[in-house]
Amino acid sequence: MCYGKCARCIGHSLVGLALLCIAANILLYFPNGETKYASENHLSRFVWFFSGIVGGGLLMLLPAFVFIGLEQDDCCGCCGHENCGKRCAMLSSVLAALIGIAGSGYCVIVAALGLAEGPLCLDSLGQWNYTFASTEGQYLLDTSTWSECTEPKHIVEWNVSLFSILLALGGIEFILCLIQVINGVLGGICGFCCSHQQQYDC
């Protein structure tokens, strides 16, 4: 098995997932495509935690690019630097993977909390509050109660959909980074898939 190619595949996957996380988080700021709720601070508190933008997004790009740089055409060096041994590079990628695990874990936790608490919305009494906070997430199974939120329109569906997407994307990122931890340790201990001659030339 070529540990470098595996890392590169994981890296490219993480880039795509990170961009999707950023997009999903940005959409949370604009229910129904409107900007007034963000400017009036009538959004769920967990939207402002930037879990998709920072945790599952920008923070995930660091390990992603590290993983991509591990697999070179000549199979020598570390991220283009020939004076860095391949095994050392694979072991160092474990640290980058741990950063990814922290970022994706943050994304998953915040998304789960956002789903459990529900959106900030205008209720039938004309007050802005977390209508479903006391249900401990049970509102997710009872869609008939979603109409209790009168404004923004369809805010429950909006929040549930996007936080669920962030939860899923963050979970996939977490698994991929965990796989890279194992891949990095095995690659560092067992070496790359290069021939002995290539390893000597390095």
From Swiss-Prot:
Residues 31-49, 115-161 are extracellular. It is a multi-pass membrane protein. It comes from the Eukaryota. It is found in: Membrane. Keywords: Glycoprotein, Membrane, Transmembrane, Transmembrane helix. Glycans are attached at N129, N159. Highly expressed in lung, breast, colon and ovarian carcinomas. It is also present on some normal cells, endothelial cells in particular. The chain crosses the membrane at residues 10-30, 50-70, 94-114, 162-182. Residues 1-9, 71-93, 183-202 are cytoplasmic. One of its GO terms (biological process) is blastocyst formation. GO terms for cellular component: membrane; plasma membrane. Present in high molecular weight complexes in tumor cells. Interacts with SDCBP2. Belongs to the L6 tetraspanin family. This is Transmembrane 4 L6 family member 1.
